[in-house]
């Protein structure tokens, strides 16, 4: 049968000139494909409708998957076995009892919690000969930070579950049982303590573990990590090598693996049943983006290896009265308790002491309760391989495509995407900083994702207008592949910086949370290589003259099976091309158009869904972890608004190669979404009952001080208090650094209020030697456990337990020492400026001595000392009034160690 004969079906024949001058017949009408083929073509052909459908499905998939993965209710199952149900019920009851009252170190309720825990521990370990209990008190004097010395009297509760193999180093479980004065401490750290009791009960009722497990129920973590520091000096501490610290820097939700000391210990977190983790938070903590610390810091600095497991949100009720039982889900407790049991069970019964990776920082994440981790070295090796392979593979392919396959990349191709990124970034900066931020500055505290989604819509519209506008003015070929290659290059540059940072990873310059760039680059680069390979293996087209011409141009990307809707039809570049010339290339062109009309779907599925999920989930976790800190400082506010812009830009990046194919309905939807978002941003209140304004309080020397961000309306809130209106007292607001203010007013004191007292007197003053002076004071602050002293030029301090005597300064060793009378010394010739004092006795007097060196030009060789003592649980009418009368969208936290303080000044 000749080429001009009909094979099957009815087909219209068209003669076509061949290079040899002969004529062949080409069919222009073929048999209609079946419905399945037509459906596949309609779905996966490069049509605007198909692309828009894919984009919408990707957005739905991304948000739904992330929401599910981060959901407490969907991912954490309550226990089903009888024993675990009993453990959870018992721990929940413990939590209710622990959090009955605020129980800071300086409160009487703290003693009640101590006694309750002492009773529960004794009851749990009764009749267990392999378990020991140490509930003795301890005293320490140490250098807690630069020029600061702290004295602490502690009453930690220590339990040792002895293992069957004494040669194995011990494993520590730690949590603190104190709260802040303004909070019931359910999450911080009642759930940690309740979980410790649950794990202790689990060990006491099961087979004796192979490895010794030690529990530290420690006190006074909130204002100096004192309980953990005191335990470091305990004899049991010497046998410990591993630890798990349980903490709460939020108020409920899921307990996340904040950070780990090294890969060798972090990798074992895959043994827990509900892992929830990301090293993004580890990077944030290590780079000081979170302005709080946990006992993890003490244990790591003491040489232990371990994990920090904690609740992290929401910070606007963290340290407030809203951190209470009624705001907590029992699943949160079970999440922490079950993971603690699993991790303890594995560590205590496994030989992990020869593990590799103990000197390697860890990179980790969890997905749907699956845990993945690797070391910095391993990821760096992968990154370097990818960095080298990308130019090695893509360079030759790009050269072949351009040189031999005649891929014409014009100026519009090269510069349209970079130009669009620059312009859109500027638009985003103006919209966010000069628009949203000025209209509703503190909105990120309650609706951060409204800002993100609205910004994303505006930026996506901007990209659509710019890219289509450039393409209209200067039509370009295969812009999709060009864009994919350019985005791959952007990720390649970013990966180089990430790899460099990881190679020098350190505290303060941590990069362990930037693993997402490896994933994003791998996906984008693979798609770009796929596109280049497709170009490389195409056949050349012969013109009637026999000369070669390019097989493909940008206009061949359209779907060509006749099912295009009106939005999918694109004008051809050369409208005056003759009908005969069209038919000359129809068969070859049709093959290429079908090939390149479907490759987009593979590229889209390879790049967009996973990239979108990685970017969205990472951005959501960062925003969810830091958005409340906008109430803490201007620096935090600047960072949050920067993250909103970066989040929006990066979320759009994966779909940029396809953005000009969005159909008009998607564009209209984006416009509507942006308009609704802008309207809401302009009208909604930044604070509400679920996302309250957080203010901090202290009454100092009879004057109430309220601290918060400038611009949140503190003076208006205070001006509505009955005592302020009735007394006519003025409210004075002073600006503080970093965007904060201190608003103060004379506190209301009814006749029956308990007024604390503070007295400081000099009890000994001598000139020890010609160049050094000595003096001592006595501080009497009934019902106060905590005081702070500020001074200058002090070289050594003494905490007296007995007779006050002046020891020869040269005889005092540097650092900490203790004499035969039980007096504690700390000497630092570089200077001590602050002393923090913490005592257990309620009416015990502080006796302190000081060695100082006066300046040569001082007229008087006296040492000025400023003393401030704090009270936590006395009646505070001004604070009670604020709790009672402020709106339900305001919460209150402590500013200092107590809610009331008195100051005194003395010269020795």
From Swiss-Prot:
Alphabetized GO MF terms: metal ion binding; metalloexopeptidase activity
Q: Which residues does the entry assign to the active site, renumbered to this chain?
A: 221 (proton acceptor)
Identify the glycosylated residues: 143, 162, 354, 627, 752, 764
Q: Name one Pfam family in it.
A: PFF1_TM
Acidic residues composition bias: residue spans:
562-579
Q: Which SUPFAM superfamilies match?
A: Zn-dependent exopeptidases
Keywords, ordered alphabetically: Glycoprotein, Hydrolase, Membrane, Metal-binding, Metalloprotease, Protease, Transmembrane, Transmembrane helix, Vacuole, Zinc
UniProt-listed Enzyme Commission number(s): 3.4.-.-
| One GO cellular component term noted in the UniProt record for this chain | vacuolar membrane
- The residues on the Cytoplasmic side of the membrane are 1-48, 403-411, 471-480, 536-602, 660-664
Residue spans of biased composition, Polar residues class: 15-25
One GO biological-process annotation of the entry reads:
proteolysis
Q: Where does it reside?
A: Vacuole membrane
Q: Where are the transmembrane segments?
A: 49-69, 382-402, 412-432, 450-470, 481-501, 515-535, 603-623, 639-659, 665-685
Q: What is this protein called?
A: Vacuolar membrane protease
